[in-house]
Amino acid sequence: MKMSEGIISPLSLSSESSEQQQAAIRKFSNGSNGSGGGGGSNLSVNSSNSGSNNSIRKSSTLMYNGPLPSINDGKELLLENSKPKVVELVNTFNHKPLSTIHSVHNEIPPPAIEKEKKEIINTISNSGVTKYMTALEILDSTINTPLNRSRSGSIGSKPICNNLTSSSSSSSTTATTPSPTTTSNNNNNNNNNNNNNNNNNNNNNNNNNNNNNNNNNNNNNNNNNNTTSTTTTTTSILISSSPPPSSSSSSSSNDEQFNNNNNNNNSNSGGSSRMITSKSQIKPLIVTSNTAATTTTTTTTNTSAPTTPTNRVQSSLDDLLFNLPTIPSNVPTVNGGPKISAVPKKVSSSKLLIPPSSNVSSSSNITLSLSSSSPSSSSSSSTSTVVPIVQLSSSNSTNSPSTSLPTTPRLSQPTTSYTQLIPSQQQQQPTESNSSSNTNTTTTSSSSSSSSSSLTISSPQPSNNSIRISAFGRSSTQFTISSNGIPSSPGQVSNKDYNNIGNLSNSSGERVKNKQYSMLNISKKTILDESDISSSPRSIGSPNSIRASISSQLPPSLSSIGGGGGGGSGPNVVSNKPLVVKKPSTSEHIKKENIWRQTMIPLTKEDHIKVVFEGIPGKRVIQKFLIDKTPIEIKSKFFEDLKDGDLLNGLTQLPSLIPEHYELKVLSVNSTISNETLPLRRQTLMQACNISRLFPKLHLILKSESTTILDGASTTTTTTTTTTTTTANQSSNIITKSNSSLDLTINNSNEIIDVKGHIQAELEIFELIGTSFTRVLDQGQEVVSFRRDFAQFRLSNFTSTRNDLSQMIYVSSEPLPLTIPNKITIMVLLPGDGKIIKRVDCCPNSSVGDVKKEIFKKFAMIDRVHTQGKTQDDFVLKVTGFREYILCIHELGNLTSRQRFYPTGSGGDFSLMDYDYIRQCVGKNQTVELSLTNNSILSLNQVSEKVSFIDKILETSDFDDYDEDLDSINSNSFDDLKQSIQQQQQQQIQTVINIKETNKENKDSNKENKDSSSNNNNNNNNNNNNNNNNNNNNNNNNNNNGNNNGNNSNNNSNSNISRGSIDSEGNGSGSGNGSEQPTLIGVQNFSLPNNSKLPINIVKRLFRVNIAGLRNLNFNNNEDARNKFADGKNNQPNVFVMAELYYGGELLTNPVFTPIAQLASYGDGSVEFPNWEKGIAFTIPIRYLPRAARASFTVYVTTISEALESQMDEVVSKSIPIGWSNCLLMNHKGMLRMGPTAFRLWDDGRRANPIGTCVDNQAAKQPIILLVEFESFIRPIVYVDTALQSMMVNDSSSISSNGVESPSIVSFSSSAASSSPLPSSPLPSPVGLKKLDLDEARRLKALMDSDPLVQLSAEDKKLVYGYRHIYKSKPKALAKFLLSVNWIDPDQVTDAYRQMNDWALLKPVQALEILDAKFADEHVRNFAIKIINSFSDAEFSDFLLQLTQVLKYEPYHNSDLTHILIQRALSNRSRIGHFFFWFLKSEMHTPEIEERYGLLLEGYLRSCGTHRQDLIKQNQVLKSLHTVAMAVKQTNGSSERKKVLMEGLSKIKFPDTFQLPLDPRWEAKGLIIDKCRYMDSKKLPLWLVFENVEPHAKPLTVIFKVGDDLRQDILTLQVLRIMDKFWKNSGMDLRLQPYKCIATGDGIGMLEVVLNANTIANINKDAGGTGALLEEKTLVNWLKECNKTEAEYNKAVETFILSCAGYVVATYVMGIGDRHSDNIMITKLGHLFHIDFGHFLGNYKKKYGFKRERAPFIFTPQYMAIVGGKDSENFKRFVTTCCSAYNILRKNTDLFINLFQLMLSTGIPELQVAEDIDYLRKALAPGLSDEEAAEEFTKNISVALNTKTVLLNDIFHGWAH
């Protein structure tokens, strides 16, 4: 779609396929000549389409008698060359608020509005002066003004058809086919009347019209001569709901004709016309199909038109027509099909019962006619033959054919429910029609059973003709027979659509399907009757039905009966209506409530399975069945439907349709359903699938066939799906698809599937994830899409074997020790029957091979039995007691690039110091303990893998419903565009390389292109022939003439490039104003298949929503509101809703509010509809909405009854938030949200969190529900990244020195003179050209050097952006620059991508900042993720906690971060995958993230191989321990608790071996029960001692906690480890002890026990209690007892000084609170460390309002005694160490702030908002120099030493415990 030609007109009642259409629009009121006085208005549309392959051109005229988006003024609107021109524009809209809009159901508009309309008409008609309106006025008036409506019926009513027959009067009104000369003259006349202001346009249009045939010939040649002739089909549809006159003629003196010509870029068509005519006297619905060998154009008598207005009005009208909601189009359309040569004269169709309460007139009719003439015959309307479509019965009608039809009943009249409308006796007789044209088609509609089924058969033929005839009845069978080279996808009509005939073209089956992008929570089984539809509480863009909003989002193939996919040319009628609102009466309030109740019905997945049959040559039939059916029932029913439907007629060789000859087979897994009498649900295969909510496709194949390859007869690449009905008993559904997208070659191997084993595996997977996850699998399209994509990823990356051995070693991730001794001692545990330990001394730099050789020699000397016949290669070294190995490099086998290591030993082998364990032992002066064991572990370098058959089924799964299935095939959203660009990168690279060489040629070509832009299409086509055949760039000029540089013949690749820009006012600009637009090379033009979707960048309409009501209002979970409004008497509750738009946590516009409404009742479950009949309009156009924009809604209750809009901020501050919800405005496929939805609100007592979850509160049983309706448009709006279209991602990405692949973006000039590439850095903006003054320079430097918590003001952003080029060499400044970008300005976004590529390369730790929620742009986040992916496995593991948390900031499940996390987790299951699993698993109880984390867990568990068994064992042990821990907590008394503990532990059945969640290297085989105990703290944690799996190894001791949230501890310990690495890398080893800690569930987790340590409280207690606490030498004495010699004691003192300094600095920086003697421990070797980090970031504990902790950190006199006193050298060393460590951390302030910022999404109570991190910034004092910071910290040491409250706190705590 061209940028400037994608005009969205509400009058465009047909949706173009892949062609462009232009329209001339005219509207006038019924005059006195009308016999019905209906007051309606008529519309005629003449459109021209051109197929892309066969050059079949179809012109259809649609005449519609209904409302238009203007008053009945008799004036004309003309669209010419995509630029609107107003002959005499009337201010047709009164500027009233939405609350004044009258209802569609009102028979007469409000008198005030009617009076105002007449005054406007009289004023303008008298003055003769055109009134101009600004774009904003027109846009605002569009939604704020009621539309003119026919008094005979509501605009929302459906056309109700009775008998369908031909009439001479109806036929005479059908347009005839004039000669080409007449057409050209008529066009010239139109141009003379309407285009006086632009002679060039007149000439151009004349040329275009006069050269139609030439252009068509050229286009045919350009399209590789696929067709040699052009066929034109003219279809005319006329609709009226008012009585017809006695006679009518083919033209009227009041009629006016407008023609508009458009050269279609997508379909390679020449000039054609589209005419819109209104006739108030034409009443019947007539469809005429004419086929001729030459081009034809429908014409009527033309009348003169006033002069054309100015360009200002054109722009205003352009804004209007781009963005209006659609008008009602209640016309079931029919594809232009083959000739119908014979139609039975006896017409019979099924009845539809009209509600008796409806006012029915028998004097009007709607007739549908299909006719076609042979190519040699003349196109005369008299040859038209009527084909019956629908018969509707009423009180005034009979079953016999007649011309009498009931008018549409007034929807304001109440009607009965749908179930009462079905006649007890309905019959349906077959109707046959034969075609004598190129394709013979027989269509039969019959019924033989009480349940309906629907069959669709597609036949690949070279022509593009299709006929659809449908009938309604209680039992019906629908057939669609398509003979299309490009498959058409006619939308089928279900039985339930009796009362929804107005939406006939949008019907998508019996159920209303939840579309992910519209969030329509409507039950699939919901049936809306007419009364409900007409009483929609609020329909912006679709006034009379919720269904209208739903169907508006369907693809064109589902939205149109005749609309075709992939080149289909039938018109596409979308049933979207303009805004209507009505203040409901009591009865309508109930109807409204019913509709919203149906919207709120939870969505459940239906248990259907698809059966595919390909026995009919060239056709594929797919039918749906319930899985409760048996195979024999399915086969019998399937073949019965085929036979009853007469689908086998015309086949020379009929297939055998005997059920016994066929079998049901799942081809994707090559498995046959053998038990014919057992229901599918009970089959083992289906049981395995049903656990995962999967239903595989079954194929009906002959039993003799062992393997099957799906038929690939269809060669088309566009896949279409036809939706069908579901029967009353839901027995079957049938769709049709082209075979191309479903081709699967099945392996010839007859591998037997262990189905029972797979069932067990599925049960294990879902037990690991959590039983609640199964409900997530039914949540919608995004979930299904993600699961399928993940399965495809697994299968595409599948290898029969993989190397897991590299995961067993830990190399080069620990910093090297500060001091490396010349010799290290290794204690080696030798294999054998006894415990044999041998000491080996070796050099630290010795290779592993040499050390192992030395050890084996000593082993052979000791034990000849175990070494006989063996060599050193039969053994390997491992860390004693841990699953960690010390291997030679050659023992690892073949490694991937990710597994590559860099050994430093001799001969290319690892040295001992390469291993982390050796480094740790040397750094801590510990003995190295290794074991010599057999080399069975080496088998892990060839681990075999198997593909789960569930993966194969997942890979071929499609969406549950047909509309979603089709949408997934036909969508061409932003993601599809991005993928298409990536696929073409190799071709684009060559284009970029040749740019400079062809620069001069391009300039000449552009000049020629510009000079010829106003010429005819022949010149444009000649222009295109000059393009390079290797890569043709089709440059589209958006100019006032609206000409396209036609269509290219392209031998290798064809890249359609859009040219044009948006000026500062948001208006499109083109070459018509004399400026040449940039040529964008290497970017594929965003083309929408069949024009089914509208690019968002052309929708200028303001974004708006309507808040319709509330349900389940209650204050149960809000203590403030409950206390304030408890009695409901003293304080009357009032309610209002605040709506906000956010992007990256920042407001896009000011908040908007509903009026404050009084609550009549609440808490009773009723639906409240306050007086909120005012749509909320935000001040941002839709086209400027970023991809990740979100809407936030907060419901407030208040005592204030009324307030002005300017006072609402104050009202909010005095109100109580009782619920909130967020929602993304675009779904995962880039589709803008439309239609109604019901939000289940979160009730945590806070206003909407702008970076909070976007999922509903599914956990609450009765949450408050907010009913919101989003505006709907003619077609779904798809996000288009304009910045992506104006730059190209170079496939040859630049590689930095450290191997980081960063995106390289090639930008091109926006200069008007050239299309040559820009330099890497664009010129600065005008503000950047001004010289910086001193103050600005200082301010800019301060901003660029500031920490991530600094908030940029508007002036700051302007300053940073203006001088962005100055700091491009500073990596840290990139984040500030990105924050200064206005992300709703496409030019700035494009520039941001360029700058990001040219900026100095970030370090991976710096890139973490860009993953914060503030950076919402997808490309920016992906840029950071690519850099982060350069982390080593050890570094990646260090930051894995943050990376899993920022998954919550990703708007969609499928993202680059998701991919990288999964890939890295699978590449190293031990170091990354293990913790990745537990980080996700521990939060599966959180409803906000359950869906995303569950999907990732499922994907990982299906991919991780044997690691899943390890996790299953861990989970089993944890469940058993949790049961015991809960039993202990529920028991009183010390002795009883101990008894319960011992009994419970002894009953646990442990696996033979299992890993502990703390560390996968820790392997155990059971518990040493007599060493286990419970601890005497508040939560009663368990002290557990596990028996090591390795004999003679030390046991594993852990603390198992239940009831404690360990997430804060995990974060604190992670930061401690990172601090320790910073210090070690800076040459400071502070001997920290950051013990291991992991959360495994909600309040469940494990902690590592540091052995040989005791708490300070216990040491003082053992030494005498309170008296010992007051004694300074207590700790000194204890330490001397543990270290007998002076040397050992001095060494312990040194260790204490270093560790104390480390924890003093760390606890001060992180603000660790609740520090007392029970939370500080010391080992016998002098290591001091802190535990239990329940409070941090300065959240110190208080007692009775007083702050108990006043010291900045803990440094007591007892500590000072160990150091040696204030005057000792040790104290000076301690102070110096503290200051140095403090300054090292200060240099990494940004990293620590980022680590905490990225954890804001965890929900940790003390880390909720960014302000909580302010303490961290203040503690690190980034504004101080090192000297100032050291001085400040020295003062804090003195303060801590002299603070007496620390001692008092310890005393009180000791007494309490």
Curated annotation (Swiss-Prot):
Polar residues compositional bias, start-end: 145-155, 270-281
Bias type Low complexity, positions: 1-32, 42-55, 162-269, 288-311, 352-464, 533-560, 1012-1056
Catalytic reaction list: a 1,2-diacyl-sn-glycero-3-phospho-(1D-myo-inositol) + ATP = a 1,2-diacyl-sn-glycero-3-phospho-(1D-myo-inositol-3-phosphate) + ADP + H(+)
Enzyme class: transferase
Domain PIK helical: 1326-1503
CDD domains: C2_PI3K_like (cd08380), PI3Ka_I (cd00872), PI3Kc (cd00891)
Region feature (Activation loop): 1730-1756
PROSITE patterns reported in the protein's UniProt record: C2_PI3K, PI3_4_KINASE_1, PI3_4_KINASE_2, PI3_4_KINASE_3, PI3K_RBD, PIK_HELICAL
Domain PI3K-RBD: 821-934
Annotated stretches, region: Catalytic loop: 1711-1719
Gene Ontology molecular function terms on file: 1-phosphatidylinositol-3-kinase activity; 1-phosphatidylinositol-4,5-bisphosphate 3-kinase activity; 1-phosphatidylinositol-4-phosphate 3-kinase activity; adenylate cyclase activator activity; adenylate cyclase inhibitor activity; ATP binding; protein kinase activator activity; small GTPase binding
Stretches the record annotates as Disordered: 1-61, 145-313, 348-468, 481-512, 530-573, 996-1078
Keywords: ATP-binding, Kinase, Nucleotide-binding, Transferase
Biological process according to GO: actin cytoskeleton organization; asexual reproduction; bleb assembly; cell migration; cell motility; chemotaxis; chemotaxis to cAMP; G protein-coupled receptor signaling pathway
Start-end of Basic and acidic residues biased regions: 997-1011
Bias kind Gly residues: ranges: 561-570
EC code: 2.7.1.137
Region (G-loop): 1574-1580
Sequence ranges assigned to domain PI3K/PI4K catalytic in this UniProt record: 1568-1845
Start and end residues of each C2 PI3K-type domain: 1099-1271
Family: Belongs to the PI3/PI4-kinase family.
PANTHER family, alphabetized: PHOSPHATIDYLINOSITOL 3-KINASE 2, PHOSPHATIDYLINOSITOL KINASE
Name the record gives this protein: Phosphatidylinositol 3-kinase 2
Organism: Dictyostelium discoideum
